[in-house]
Amino acid sequence: MSLADLRKDYTLAGLAEKDLARDPFRQFEKWFQEAEAAKLAEPNAMTLATASPDGRPSARTVLLKGLDGRGFVFYSNYESRKGRELALNARVALVFPWIALERQVLIEGTVTTVAREESAAYFHSRPRASQLGAWVAQQSSVIPGRATLEEAMKALEKKHAGAEIPLPPNWGGYRVAPETIEFWQGRRSRLHDRLRYRRDKEGGWLVERLSP
Protein backbone atom coordinates (compact mmCIF):
# COMPACT_ATOMS: atom_id res chain seq x y z
CA MET A 1 0.00 0.00 0.00
CA SER A 2 1.46 3.34 -1.09
CA LEU A 3 0.39 6.48 0.76
CA ALA A 4 3.07 8.87 -0.43
CA ASP A 5 0.77 10.58 -2.95
CA LEU A 6 -2.06 11.23 -0.48
CA ARG A 7 -1.83 14.94 0.17
CA LYS A 8 -3.95 18.07 0.21
CA ASP A 9 -3.08 21.75 0.23
CA TYR A 10 -4.93 23.66 2.95
CA THR A 11 -6.62 26.80 1.65
CA LEU A 12 -9.78 27.47 3.68
CA ALA A 13 -8.55 30.08 6.15
CA GLY A 14 -5.71 31.63 8.09
CA LEU A 15 -5.26 32.49 11.74
CA ALA A 16 -3.75 35.82 12.78
CA GLU A 17 -2.99 37.12 16.26
CA LYS A 18 -5.30 40.09 15.74
CA ASP A 19 -8.25 37.75 15.23
CA LEU A 20 -7.78 35.79 18.45
CA ALA A 21 -9.97 36.20 21.50
CA ARG A 22 -8.02 37.31 24.57
CA ASP A 23 -9.26 34.28 26.48
CA PRO A 24 -8.51 30.82 25.02
CA PHE A 25 -11.83 29.42 26.25
CA ARG A 26 -13.67 32.09 24.24
CA GLN A 27 -11.52 31.26 21.21
CA PHE A 28 -12.34 27.57 21.64
CA GLU A 29 -16.05 28.34 21.87
CA LYS A 30 -15.82 30.38 18.66
CA TRP A 31 -14.16 27.56 16.76
CA PHE A 32 -16.50 24.98 18.29
CA GLN A 33 -19.55 26.95 17.17
CA GLU A 34 -18.09 27.14 13.66
CA ALA A 35 -17.57 23.36 13.71
CA GLU A 36 -21.22 22.92 14.72
CA ALA A 37 -22.37 25.36 12.02
CA ALA A 38 -20.39 23.36 9.45
CA LYS A 39 -22.33 20.27 10.62
CA LEU A 40 -19.22 18.30 11.45
CA ALA A 41 -20.02 14.88 12.83
CA GLU A 42 -19.61 14.94 16.62
CA PRO A 43 -17.52 18.11 16.91
CA ASN A 44 -17.15 17.36 20.63
CA ALA A 45 -15.20 14.16 19.89
CA MET A 46 -11.63 14.47 21.12
CA THR A 47 -8.62 12.21 21.40
CA LEU A 48 -7.53 11.80 25.02
CA ALA A 49 -3.89 10.78 25.51
CA THR A 50 -2.75 9.39 28.84
CA ALA A 51 0.40 7.64 30.02
CA SER A 52 1.30 5.13 32.69
CA PRO A 53 3.83 6.14 35.36
CA ASP A 54 6.58 4.36 33.39
CA GLY A 55 5.75 6.38 30.27
CA ARG A 56 3.70 3.86 28.26
CA PRO A 57 1.20 5.98 26.25
CA SER A 58 -2.38 5.19 25.30
CA ALA A 59 -5.06 7.15 23.49
CA ARG A 60 -8.76 6.91 22.74
CA THR A 61 -11.65 9.08 21.57
CA VAL A 62 -13.97 10.49 24.24
CA LEU A 63 -16.66 13.18 24.15
CA LEU A 64 -16.41 16.66 25.62
CA LYS A 65 -19.41 17.13 27.91
CA GLY A 66 -18.65 20.39 29.67
CA LEU A 67 -16.54 23.52 29.36
CA ASP A 68 -16.05 26.56 31.56
CA GLY A 69 -13.19 28.67 32.87
CA ARG A 70 -11.94 25.76 34.95
CA GLY A 71 -11.43 23.37 32.06
CA PHE A 72 -12.74 20.65 29.75
CA VAL A 73 -14.98 17.91 31.17
CA PHE A 74 -15.51 14.31 30.06
CA TYR A 75 -16.97 11.24 31.77
CA SER A 76 -15.73 7.68 32.06
CA ASN A 77 -15.32 4.56 34.16
CA TYR A 78 -12.75 5.22 36.89
CA GLU A 79 -11.59 1.58 36.71
CA SER A 80 -10.93 1.61 32.95
CA ARG A 81 -7.38 1.72 31.62
CA LYS A 82 -7.62 5.49 31.28
CA GLY A 83 -9.01 5.76 34.79
CA ARG A 84 -6.19 3.68 36.27
CA GLU A 85 -3.59 5.72 34.41
CA LEU A 86 -5.14 9.03 35.42
CA ALA A 87 -5.11 7.96 39.08
CA LEU A 88 -1.33 7.59 38.86
CA ASN A 89 -0.41 10.24 36.28
CA ALA A 90 -2.73 13.24 35.98
CA ARG A 91 -1.00 14.85 32.99
CA VAL A 92 -2.98 14.50 29.75
CA ALA A 93 -3.39 15.85 26.23
CA LEU A 94 -6.58 16.39 24.22
CA VAL A 95 -6.87 16.83 20.46
CA PHE A 96 -9.97 18.03 18.58
CA PRO A 97 -9.42 17.01 14.91
CA TRP A 98 -11.74 19.25 12.89
CA ILE A 99 -10.28 18.02 9.63
CA ALA A 100 -13.07 19.30 7.36
CA LEU A 101 -12.25 22.84 8.53
CA GLU A 102 -8.49 22.20 8.24
CA ARG A 103 -8.22 22.84 11.98
CA GLN A 104 -7.23 21.15 15.16
CA VAL A 105 -6.97 22.19 18.80
CA LEU A 106 -4.35 20.67 21.09
CA ILE A 107 -4.76 21.01 24.86
CA GLU A 108 -2.23 19.94 27.48
CA GLY A 109 -2.97 20.01 31.17
CA THR A 110 -3.74 18.23 34.41
CA VAL A 111 -6.87 16.25 35.22
CA THR A 112 -8.94 16.08 38.41
CA THR A 113 -12.21 14.31 39.13
CA VAL A 114 -15.33 16.47 39.24
CA ALA A 115 -17.60 16.66 42.28
CA ARG A 116 -19.84 13.65 42.81
CA GLU A 117 -22.92 15.89 42.60
CA GLU A 118 -21.83 17.15 39.17
CA SER A 119 -21.27 13.60 37.94
CA ALA A 120 -24.70 12.55 39.24
CA ALA A 121 -26.43 15.46 37.52
CA TYR A 122 -24.87 14.55 34.18
CA PHE A 123 -25.44 10.81 34.68
CA HIS A 124 -29.17 11.29 35.23
CA SER A 125 -29.42 13.50 32.12
CA ARG A 126 -28.31 10.57 29.95
CA PRO A 127 -30.73 8.20 28.21
CA ARG A 128 -31.84 5.39 30.52
CA ALA A 129 -30.13 2.76 28.36
CA SER A 130 -26.84 4.65 28.65
CA GLN A 131 -27.23 4.78 32.43
CA LEU A 132 -27.69 1.02 32.52
CA GLY A 133 -24.75 0.60 30.16
CA ALA A 134 -22.48 2.38 32.63
CA TRP A 135 -23.28 -0.33 35.17
CA VAL A 136 -22.89 -3.17 32.67
CA ALA A 137 -19.55 -2.14 31.17
CA GLN A 138 -16.56 -3.22 33.25
CA GLN A 139 -14.49 -1.12 30.90
CA SER A 140 -11.20 -2.53 29.56
CA SER A 141 -11.71 -5.93 31.23
CA VAL A 142 -11.61 -9.13 29.15
CA ILE A 143 -15.02 -10.77 28.62
CA PRO A 144 -15.92 -14.13 26.99
CA GLY A 145 -18.30 -12.62 24.42
CA ARG A 146 -20.98 -10.05 23.66
CA ALA A 147 -23.63 -12.27 25.24
CA THR A 148 -22.09 -11.43 28.62
CA LEU A 149 -23.01 -7.77 28.11
CA GLU A 150 -26.49 -8.47 26.76
CA GLU A 151 -27.37 -10.82 29.62
CA ALA A 152 -26.13 -8.33 32.22
CA MET A 153 -28.15 -5.57 30.53
CA LYS A 154 -31.35 -7.63 30.70
CA ALA A 155 -30.77 -8.42 34.36
CA LEU A 156 -30.25 -4.75 35.23
CA GLU A 157 -33.32 -3.67 33.24
CA LYS A 158 -35.36 -6.09 35.34
CA LYS A 159 -33.71 -5.05 38.62
CA HIS A 160 -34.30 -1.32 38.08
CA ALA A 161 -37.67 -1.51 36.31
CA GLY A 162 -39.69 1.58 37.20
CA ALA A 163 -36.96 2.95 39.48
CA GLU A 164 -34.24 5.56 39.21
CA ILE A 165 -30.86 4.14 38.28
CA PRO A 166 -28.17 5.14 40.81
CA LEU A 167 -24.82 6.58 39.81
CA PRO A 168 -22.22 3.78 39.74
CA PRO A 169 -19.49 4.28 42.35
CA ASN A 170 -16.80 3.72 39.72
CA TRP A 171 -18.14 6.19 37.15
CA GLY A 172 -17.93 9.96 36.91
CA GLY A 173 -16.36 13.03 35.43
CA TYR A 174 -12.88 14.38 34.87
CA ARG A 175 -11.90 17.99 34.33
CA VAL A 176 -8.77 18.91 32.36
CA ALA A 177 -7.31 22.21 33.58
CA PRO A 178 -5.27 23.45 30.60
CA GLU A 179 -1.72 24.72 30.81
CA THR A 180 -1.47 25.25 27.05
CA ILE A 181 -4.10 25.45 24.29
CA GLU A 182 -2.86 25.48 20.71
CA PHE A 183 -5.04 26.46 17.76
CA TRP A 184 -3.80 25.02 14.47
CA GLN A 185 -5.04 26.22 11.09
CA GLY A 186 -3.82 24.49 7.94
CA ARG A 187 -2.21 26.74 5.31
CA ARG A 188 -0.70 26.43 1.84
CA SER A 189 2.70 24.79 1.37
CA ARG A 190 2.50 23.32 4.88
CA LEU A 191 3.23 26.76 6.39
CA HIS A 192 0.46 26.29 8.91
CA ASP A 193 -0.67 28.82 11.51
CA ARG A 194 -0.04 27.63 15.07
CA LEU A 195 -1.00 29.97 17.89
CA ARG A 196 -0.59 28.75 21.45
CA TYR A 197 -1.98 30.15 24.67
CA ARG A 198 0.26 29.38 27.65
CA ARG A 199 -0.37 30.05 31.34
CA ASP A 200 1.95 32.66 32.85
CA LYS A 201 3.08 32.90 36.48
CA GLU A 202 0.23 35.28 37.33
CA GLY A 203 -2.41 32.90 36.02
CA GLY A 204 -3.02 34.85 32.81
CA TRP A 205 -2.38 33.75 29.26
CA LEU A 206 0.53 34.44 26.92
CA VAL A 207 0.03 33.97 23.17
CA GLU A 208 2.91 32.54 21.14
CA ARG A 209 3.22 31.75 17.45
CA LEU A 210 4.89 28.40 16.81
CA SER A 211 6.76 27.42 13.69
CA PRO A 212 4.86 24.85 11.60
Regions found by a protein language model. Give the residues of each.
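Binding-site signature for planar aromatic cofactors or substrates
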Residues: M1-P212
